From Swiss-Prot:
UniProt keyword Membrane, yes or no: yes
TM stretches of this protein: 9-29, 39-59, 91-111, 125-145, 147-167, 185-205, 224-244, 258-278, 280-300, 327-347, 354-374, 396-416, 425-445, 549-569, 603-623, 721-741
MF (Gene Ontology): NADH dehydrogenase (ubiquinone) activity; quinone binding
Name of the featured protein: NAD(P)H-quinone oxidoreductase subunit 5, chloroplastic
Pfam families: Proton_antipo_C, Proton_antipo_M, Proton_antipo_N
Keyword terms: Chloroplast, Membrane, NAD, NADP, Plastid, Plastoquinone, Quinone, Thylakoid, Translocase, Transmembrane, Transmembrane helix, Transport
Protein species of origin: Spinacia oleracea
Record's GO cellular component terms: chloroplast thylakoid membrane
Intracellular or extracellular location(s): Plastid, Chloroplast thylakoid membrane
Functional summary from the UniProt entry: NDH shuttles electrons from NAD(P)H:plastoquinone, via FMN and iron-sulfur (Fe-S) centers, to quinones in the photosynthetic chain and possibly in a chloroplast respiratory chain. The immediate electron acceptor for the enzyme in this species is believed to be plastoquinone. Couples the redox reaction to proton translocation, and thus conserves the redox energy in a proton gradient.
Family: Belongs to the complex I subunit 5 family.
Membrane topology: Multi-pass membrane protein
Assembly mode: NDH is composed of at least 16 different subunits, 5 of which are encoded in the nucleus.
Any one GO biological process: electron transport coupled proton transport
Length: 742
């Protein structure tokens, strides 16, 4: 079967003809290309399906034979330098290829209907196809140079798609923010690659790992320099996977179309950082300090993402912060050395998160029939509510995805998340406590999203939620309050830390008041939606078309069953752990003397604890967000909380602190804006002044002085010989006078 591997080089290039042909068609035959636009969507899906089938065949071959195949072409060779390009087919490559293709195919099918009203339909599919090509090229790369090339292409495509509606200033700003933030990590990655080449003299993974490990083992290289290079490599993953402190671009990236949000969060851009750390893990494991840094950054991101999600009203931003938190779990697992567990959670999270984002896109699409094109309203959860009877299939999809991400068995994320939580006890009890606490917090805010969206009544016709906003740069808490606009204010460090809201937070909604229902027209005439304004406007949302529902149903099946590939049981006559066989040999620092299998009793005891925490978070969410007419509302219990006196005041203060922290994004964006952005701008203005006034001023001063001296001499001479003779005799007389008397 080795001949199968010989043709694996076509994997990244099969989707490439679509963007090339779309570009050529729009250049030479624009009318025909636009009229036949759905053919290009069909071509994108068909070519990607071929890649998926080929990847599956390679994966089956690797499961059966545990083979690794690498093919290289020499690009340049001389005495001191050699550079080769090729492809590497190993378990990590096959897993990522299958993950990318399956999710991307479903997203493309979904996008055909979701983007049908957009004049940028062809541009969207061209970007998406090139995005898939770049990501497939990244995961099949055999050396760091190829990794970096495709790494930059993945970033470029993501910027294009985040700023897809570039005529909206908010989307353009989000694109710039993603670009600038990722520049920091990408520059670190480039420096790390160059540093490793200086140490090892190779870019190829196999040679690099072997040489680097030998140098470290024999103490033949400066350890501080090795730590620095490894940290710079990790910095690239921190930015790409939205880890603290370079996470600030991810929530704003939701300004792009919802299908690309699903693809970015499930299987492409943010997964690229996890893939890079997994690929370079043999290099990181020989440097314990870097492993500590990876796990520490991971656990901070886990907690930070969960707390920042609490006060969001925008459904896509809430899911974005959840993605950030789950990526932190994966990074924590890699830092602990649980290679298999991290990849397992990457797989299960990808399908569950794609399901949630596509379901949220269906909701946004349906809400658009009421509010028109207005992201401030169509994505606002507190304007939703009571959608169960209007969008039952979407509701079921969202509920299954929510239960999976909360860690409820037997759904996919339960199996992988539970393994990470168990491994965290072995690694660090403090990290384990934070991880378990965040698991409960995750269940709370995920069910908050579900209850605000689907339970109760449609709140768009009520006034008790502040739904009208001037821009999308706001975050509204679960209590329906505006976030302070701190970014454009002049604030000091003291004000930054003591930032507060003037209104008082409350868990409970106020009495609803009816408002005058008026469906506004499109607020932004420059948006490329042609006839959405005048058609399909109704008083209530309705279920999406079958083209959008089909991917949801397929993702439900993945969410239900994909977790079973990694069940860690190995009893008599039963060998269910396909993932471990697939990843053989793999790295596991926490269980180096075991076979990664546990018995039923140990598994059940650990699972009961994590499930109990998840159900506790769900119960708290139901307690606060279940509709007021629900039988689950215990008003005696609620009133008992309202009569606590001093304890009530303390509780309200704690709630306000949590709200302010979450609504202001942990003050991190404000800190960057105040001290970094303004500081850099002030420094650049100072440098510009020094350059223009000092550096350029010196030669300009000499030039101006010479000009005026020459002009003065010209007017003094006047062009007459008698004047020249007079001045000549005058200067000679003065010279003789001075010489005589000195």
């Amino acid at each position: 079967m080795e001949h199968i591997y010989q043709y694996a080089w076509i994997i990244p290039f099969l989707p490439l003809p679509v963007p090339l042909l779309i570009g050529a068609g729009l250049l030479f035959f624009p009318t025909a290309t636009k009229n036949l636009r759905r053919i290009w969507a069909f071509s994108s899906i068909s070519l990607l399906s071929i890649v998926m089938i080929f990847s599956m065949k390679l994966a089956i071959q690797q499961i059966n034979s545990n083979s690794i195949y690498q093919y290289l072409w020499s690009w340049t060779i001389n005495n001191d330098f050699s550079l080769e390009f090729g492809y590497l087919m190993d378990p990590l490559t096959s897993i990522m290829s299958m993950l990318i293709t399956t999710v991307a195919i479903l997203v493309l099918i979904y996008s055909d209907n979701y983007m049908s009203h957009d004049q940028g339909y062809l541009r969207f599919f061209a970007y998406m196809s090139f995005f898939n090509t770049s990501m497939l090229g990244l995961v099949t790369s055999s050396n760091l140079i190829q990794i970096y090339i495709f790494w930059e292409l993945v970033g470029m495509c993501s910027y294009l798609l985040i700023g897809f509606w570039f005529t909206r200033p908010i989307a353009a700003n989000a694109c710039q923010k993603a670009f600038v933030t990722n520049r920091v990590g990408d520059f670190g990655l480039l420096l790390g690659i160059l540093g490793l080449y200086w140490i090892t003299g190779s870019f190829e993974f196999r040679d690099l790992f072997e040489i680097f490990n030998n140098l470290i083992k024999n103490n033949e290289v400066n350890s501080l320099f090795c730590i620095l290079c490894a940290f710079l490599l990790f910095a690239g993953a921190v930015a790409k996977s939205a880890q603290f402190p370079l996470h600030v671009w991810l929530p704003d990236a939701m300004e792009g179309p919802t299908p690309i949000s699903a693809l970015i969060h499930a299987a492409t851009m943010v997964a690229a950082g996890i893939f890079l750390v997994a690929r370079l893990l043999p290099l990181f494991v020989v440097i314990p300090y870097i492993m500590y840094v990876i796990s520490f950054i991971g656990i901070i991101t886990v907690l930070l993402g969960a707390t920042l999600a609490l006060a969001q009203k925008d459904i896509k931003r809430s899911l974005a912060y959840y993605t950030m938190s789950q990526l932190g779990y994966m990074m924590l697992a890699l830092g602990m050395g649980s290679y298999r567990t991290a990849l397992f959670h990457l797989i299960t999270h990808a399908y569950s998160k794609a399901l949630l984002f596509l379901a949220s896109g269906s909701l946004i699409h349906s809400m658009g029939t009421i509010v028109g094109y207005s992201p401030d309203k169509s994505q606002n959860m507190v304007l939703m509510g009571g959608l169960t009877k209007h969008v039952p299939i979407t509701k079921t999809s969202f509920l299954i995805g929510t239960l999976s991400l909360c860690g409820i068995p037997p759904l996919a994320c339960f199996w992988s998340k539970d393994e990470i939580l168990n491994d965290s006890w072995v690694y660090s009890p403090i990290f384990a406590i934070i991880a378990y606490f965040t698991a409960g917090l995750t269940a709370f805010y995920m069910f908050r999203i579900y209850l605000l969206t689907f339970e109760g009544h449609l709140n768009f016709f009520c006034k008790n939620y502040s739904g009208k906003k001037s821009s999308s740069f706001y975050s509204i808490s679960l209590w329906g309050k505006k976030e302070l606009k701190t970014i454009n204010q002049k604030i000091s460090l003291l004000n930054l830390l003591t930032m507060n809201n003037k209104e008082r937070a409350s868990f409970f909604s106020k009495k609803p008041y009816e408002i005058n229902v008026k469906l506004t027209k499109l607020l932004r005439s420059f948006i490329t939606i042609t006839y959405f304004e005048n058609k399909n406007i109704s008083l209530y949302p309705y279920e999406s078309d079958n083209t959008m529902l089909f991917p949801l149903i397929i993702l439900i099946m993945f969410t239900l069953f994909v977790g079973f590939i990694g069940i860690p049981f190995n009893q008599e006559g039963m060998d269910l752990d396909i993932l471990t066989k697939w990843l053989t040999p793999s790295i596991n620092l926490l269980h180096s003397n075991s076979e990664n299998f546990v018995d039923w009793y140990e598994f059940v005891i650990n699972a009961i604890f994590s499930i109990s925490i998840a159900f506790f978070g769900i119960f708290i969410a139901f307690f606060f967000y279940k509709p007021i007419y629900s039988s689950l509302k215990n008003f005696d219990l609620i009133n008992s909380f309202d009569k606590r006196g001093q304890k009530r005041i303390l509780g309200d203060n704690i709630i306000t602190i949590i709200y302010n922290w979450s609504a202001n994004r942990g003050y991190i964006d404000a800190f960057y804006s105040t001290f970094l952005i303004k500081g850099i701008r002030s420094l650049s203005e100072l440098v510009s002044f020094f350059d223009r006034r000092i550096i350029d001023g010196i030669p300009n001063g000499f030039g101006v002085t010479s000009f005026f001296v020459g002009e003065g001499i010209k007017y003094v001479g006047g062009g007459r010989i008698s004047s020249y003779l007079f001045w000549y005799l005058l200067y000679v007389s003065i010279f003789l006078f001075i010489f005589t008397f000195t």
